[in-house]
């Protein structure tokens, strides 16, 4: 039977490479977090615009209905 080949790396090299990989992973995580945060801000802005328009239309409709009533009261 054939044996599974194994590789032995020096501990110092392994730790150095592991530290570099951790640094790269941290950078990637921060970049992804910033991208997701920007996407969230854009979505929040769009939802805010939609709510603003809806409330504005309701406000204009209510004022259009209520203001003529004040003319009748005079």
Curated annotation (Swiss-Prot):
One of its GO terms (molecular function) is tetrahydromethanopterin S-methyltransferase activity. InterPro entries: THM_MeTrfase_su_G (IPR005866). It catalyses: 5-methyl-5,6,7,8-tetrahydromethanopterin + coenzyme M + 2 Na(+)(in) = 5,6,7,8-tetrahydromethanopterin + methyl-coenzyme M + 2 Na(+)(out). Its EC number is 7.2.1.4. The chain crosses the membrane at residues 47-67. One of its GO terms (biological process) is one-carbon metabolic process. Pathway: One-carbon metabolism; methanogenesis from CO(2); methyl-coenzyme M from 5,10-methylene-5,6,7,8-tetrahydromethanopterin: step 2/2. It is a single-pass membrane protein. Keywords: Cell membrane, Membrane, Methanogenesis, Methyltransferase, One-carbon metabolism, Transferase, Translocase, Transmembrane, Transmembrane helix. It is found in: Cell membrane. One of its GO terms (cellular component) is plasma membrane. Belongs to the MtrG family. NCBIfam families: mtrG. The complex is composed of 8 subunits; MtrA, MtrB, MtrC, MtrD, MtrE, MtrF, MtrG and MtrH. Part of a complex that catalyzes the formation of methyl-coenzyme M and tetrahydromethanopterin from coenzyme M and methyl-tetrahydromethanopterin. This is an energy-conserving, sodium-ion translocating step. This is Tetrahydromethanopterin S-methyltransferase subunit G. It comes from Methanococcus maripaludis (strain DSM 14266 / JCM 13030 / NBRC 101832 / S2 / LL). The lineage of its organism: Archaea, Methanobacteriati, Methanobacteriota, Methanomada group, Methanococci.
């Amino acid at each position: 039977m054939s044996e599974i080949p194994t590789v032995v790396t020096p501990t110092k090299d392994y730790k150095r490479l592991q530290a570099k990989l951790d640094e790269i992973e941290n950078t990637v995580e921060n970049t992804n977090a910033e991208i997701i945060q920007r996407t969230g801000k854009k979505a929040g802005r769009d939802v805010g615009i939609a709510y603003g328009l809806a409330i504005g239309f309701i406000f204009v409709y209510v004022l259009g209905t209520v203001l003529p009533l004040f003319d009748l009261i005079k």
